[in-house]
Amino acid sequence: MRRIPGEFWYTEGDGTTTRLISGILAGQTFSSHLTGDASIQKRPMGRIISPLRSMGASIESLRGNGCAPLRIEGRPLQGIHYDSPVASAQVKSCVLLAGLYANAVTSVTEPALSRNHTELMLRYFGGQVTAEGKTASVSPEPKLRGGKGEVPGDISSAAYFLAAALLVPGSEVLLKHVGVNPTRDGILRVIRSMAGDVRLLNKTVSGCEPAADLLIRYGSLHGTDIGGDLIPTLIDELPILAVLAAFADGTTTIRDAGELRVKESDRLSILVESLTAMGADVTGTEDGMIIRGGRSLHGAVIDSHLDHRIAMSFAVAALAADGETDILHADCVRISYPDFYRDLEQLLQ
C-alpha cells in the first residue's frame, strides 16, 4: 500500500488490504481515503460498508456504486453482532479489526466457516478472541502486545506446484514449510478425492499456524464434486483445481462458487473461456461449472485479464498441453508471486 497525490492510500489490486485496513481506519481519530487499481474499483465494498456503518463508522463509496474509492471518517465505534451474508474472511476480519476499537465485544457469524488467520494472529498477540462454530468474537481489551511472528509458506502459492507435479509425468515435488491451516486446506482434500498422491510430512506449528512439508507425486486423477462448506477453504485455489479437472478422467462439478465472479476478474467466465480455448469440454453455470475431463488439451492464447491466479493457473496448464500457450498480461503475477515464473522454470530443470 502506498500514498498517491490527493491524500489517497493506494492498495494496488489487493482486496484483502483494502477491506482489512478499512476496519482499522474506521476506529481512528482521523479521516482516510482508499482506492486501488481498476480491479479494486470494481470489487464490492458494500459488504464491509454495511457492518462498519452498523458500528457507527462513517464510510462511503465516493462514486456511490458500493466500490472504491472509499472515504472513511474515523469515529468511536460500537460493539455489534453481525450475521454476514457471505462466508468471507475479508469481511469477517474487517469487522473483527474494527472491533478492537469498539466499546464492547464484536462478533461475526458466517454461513460457512472461512479462513481464520486473523483470529489466530490476534490471539497470538494477546487479543481476547473466541471462536465457536461459525461465530468469532473479539474484545477491545486487553490491548494487543508486540512480538515476533513467523508465517509459513502460502498454500495458495504452493497450489500451482502441487498441480504441476500431478500433471507432469515422473514428477515428485517436496514443498517445505507450507501452511496447512484446516480452514485453508481444501485443496489438499480435493486432490485426495481425485486420487492424487499428496502427503504431509514434518508437521509443526509456525507462530500461530500449523505447517508441514508437502510431498506430491504425479498420478492419474479422476473427477470429483467441489461445493458447499468446502468452497471457503479453497476459494483462491479453484482456478488451478479447474485446470486439474480438465486433465482428470470423468466429470468434475464446481458449485456454490459465485464469489469467483467478484474477484480480480469474473473468474468463472474466464475459466470457461480459457479452458474451452485449450480444447476442454466445459459448461459454465451461474455459480460454477461442469468440466468433463480426459481430453487432450492444446496450446492457446490465454487472456489473463490482469488476474494473477488466471495467469499462474494457465502457465501450469501449458505444461501438460500440446503445443505453445501464450498468456497475455502474464506479468500480473507480481501482485502475489513476483518470482513465480522463475520458480516454475527451476522446478522444470
Where in the sequence are the language-model features?
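Structural preference for solvent-exposed beta-strand-turn elements
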Residues: 1-349
